């Protein structure tokens, strides 16, 4: 009886299609894992029982402050210090290597189970989708109204939030589609937050 030497997680167009295992007759102390999504590739070696912890988590206060500061500097004509949002591709999601991903790309986790990451700098080669955060709000009705002023439609997604994407879209009175992206999630302090983004 052999053991697994390699794991290949293959996604096409953001959908996980195959999980391929390479086994041989040797005993292995570590397993080579390769996550592929179209042209994106992320590889690492997994040692049994080894798991990279998540980096510092973002609480709602930090997130709102960073988002507000970026927006204020843009309105004042000063060079903006934008906030970027990163969503791993389907293969990374299947592999569950979020701590390693964040460490390798210098990102902070938005929340413990959100699987979304933020940074003040744009990261080249990130395996997944990248967005610039144009605004952030709690679920406070007035804050949401100000955040979504003039936006009639958006692509809505939720991560670690008690509402489905359809429920959130209805609550926000948005049509599906357009070039705006709305992410609903839970920050590290347990606050439900809404991020308004543009895809890069």
State where each predicted segment sits.
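SAM-dependent transferase fold signal centered on methyltransferase-like domains
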Residues: 1-200
């Amino acid at each position: 009886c052999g053991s697994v030497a390699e794991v290949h997680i293959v996604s096409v167009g953001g959908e996980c299609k195959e999980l391929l295992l390479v086994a041989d007759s040797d005993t292995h102390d570590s397993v080579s894992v390769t996550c592929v999504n179209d042209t994106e590739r992320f590889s690492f070696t997994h040692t049994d029982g080894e798991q990279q912890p998540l980096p510092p988590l973002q609480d709602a206060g930090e997130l709102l402050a960073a988002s507000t500061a970026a927006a204020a500097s843009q309105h004042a004509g000063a060079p903006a210090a934008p906030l970027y949002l990163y969503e791993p591709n389907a293969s990374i999601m299947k592999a569950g290597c979020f701590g390693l991903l964040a460490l390798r790309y210098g990102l902070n986790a938005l929340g413990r189970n959100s699987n979304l990451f933020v940074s003040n700098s744009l990261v080249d080669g990130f395996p997944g989708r990248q967005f610039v955060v144009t605004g952030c709000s709690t679920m406070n009705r007035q804050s949401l109204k100000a955040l979504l002023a003039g936006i009639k439609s958006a692509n809505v997604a939720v991560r670690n939030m008690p509402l489905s994407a359809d429920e959130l879209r209805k609550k926000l009175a948005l049509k599906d589609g357009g070039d705006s992206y709305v992410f609903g999630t839970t920050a590290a302090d347990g606050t439900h937050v809404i991020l308004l983004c543009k895809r890069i």
